[in-house]
Amino acid sequence: MQIPTDAVLLRIFIGENDRFENHPLYEAIVLKAREMHLGGATVLRGPMGFGHSSRLHTAKLLRLSEDLPFIVEIVDSEEKINQFLPVLDTMIGSGLVTIENIKVLQYGVKS
């Protein structure tokens, strides 16, 4: 599988406790992206953040927060990301979704 040099980065900002069909939402998103043969996906866990509610979520020891911020990043062509968006829309109830144009410098193992 190849990703074009001019590609798109899809970022999905959700909470650790968000669910889809009794599974963690971040896991369901990555598995669906894999099923749809998207170029790659990574889940990042944030130690601190806030969203539209302005409620602070933190991993500090003295203030154990549940529902830490998670970011799912998916990279592929604009066409394939656009095909994924309607599927994603059925999965997320709240969160922030962004798209950025990127340049892919390397994908996979160098020959």
Give residue spans per PLM region.
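Positively charged, small/polar-rich N-terminal and surface patches that mediate targeting and assembly
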Residues: 1-111
